[in-house]
Amino acid sequence: TLETGIAIVAFIKIAVSLAWLITVAAQPTMGVAWHRFLAFFNVWFQRNADGRPALGALQPIAVKGEAIDFENIDELDDDASLGVGAIGDFTWKALLDVNTCTECGRCQSQCPAWNTEKPLSPKLLTLALREQSHAAAPWLQAAADQRSDLHEDVLGIAERQLIADGDGDPWAQTSGGVMSPDVLWSCTTCGACVQQCPVDIAHIDHIVDMRRYQVLMASDFPNELNGLFKNIENKGNPWGMNASDRNAWIEEVDFPVRVFGMDGEDEIPADVEYLFWVGCAGAFEDRAKQTTKAVAELLHMAGVEFMVLGEGETCNGDPARRAGNEFLFQMQAMQNVEVLNEIKATKIVVT
């Protein structure tokens, strides 16, 4: 009868559902199954409350959930970790992120590093962190005062560094690390992975946090970045160019460009409506200079009075921040804020 048929179908559906739940309970590492439970919570607690993907300015470096100011760095505990060096350094939201991955591969398909045959895959990176979080689960779940009593194997897994000391298999789960340095440093921080993720995983935040540890705690980063950091700190730009060359593009336009300080100004004159922040690339890089000149020409043709800082500009620290040197970024940012406050700049145009 119809009633019997409905009962049989209902029984089969219930049996299949129970079998699925038993399977998931027996194999908690089945991430494809767990995302069905976790996706809602991950999206609910997403980084941006307005519903936008987890893109935009990088989050400040935090210790124990509190954003830190490097002016007060001496007040930190001796055991404080800047950035993320082991799985236990991640926040609860970061651990929720990696365990919510659906393994759909959208992030990987859009990643410029992966598509140019670099070892980085946002998907594999997320899965590697997920596997490490599962392996260290007893340590993560234990109370802080009980962790020292755990078995030494568990302690060894929990203390395993995320980034290996040398090159090798990019994703080898060995005592030397969870992933190779090449994986970490292949990221361009473009944000394509975050934009494509259907469950709002913040890949870039996690990558930059691991870079911060490598730079600020382990002092283990590519040699090329050493030159970058020194140039920004000493010369005020990533390429080590002289500050006097910031005005070179002005000689290539056929209209006057006012430069702050050339007439002895202490602050932006009242007749100047906008300060044009040219930036390092806009002042030194040939292709970017074309954009700088085009914007200046548009302002001139529109009759807008504007002024540039010229030699008074310095790097905003963004390259250092993307590379994990949060200390250098904050130093550059505070220097620029001080300059802009001194000259009383209220309207700024950037490209």
Task: Please report, for each region that a protein language model flagged, where it lies by residue.
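Acidic, Ser/Thr-rich low-complexity segments on the non-lumenal side of membrane proteins
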Residues: 56-115
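Membrane-embedded alpha-helical bundles of multi-pass integral membrane proteins
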Residues: 1-76, 83-84, 123, 127, ...
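Iron-sulfur-cluster electron-transfer modules
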Residues: 89-98, 120-124, 133-351
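Generic recognition of flexible, low-complexity loop/linker segments
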Residues: 3-14, 23-26, 90, 96-99, ...
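Short helix/loop capping segments that flank catalytic or ligand/cofactor-binding pockets
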Residues: 36-39, 46, 54, 110, ...
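Short acidic (Asp/Glu) and glycine-rich catalytic loops that position anionic groups and cofactors
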Residues: 17-21, 104-108, 187-191, 206-207
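Short, well-ordered loop/turn and helix-capping segments at boundaries between secondary-structure elements
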Residues: 30, 39-46, 50, 113, ...
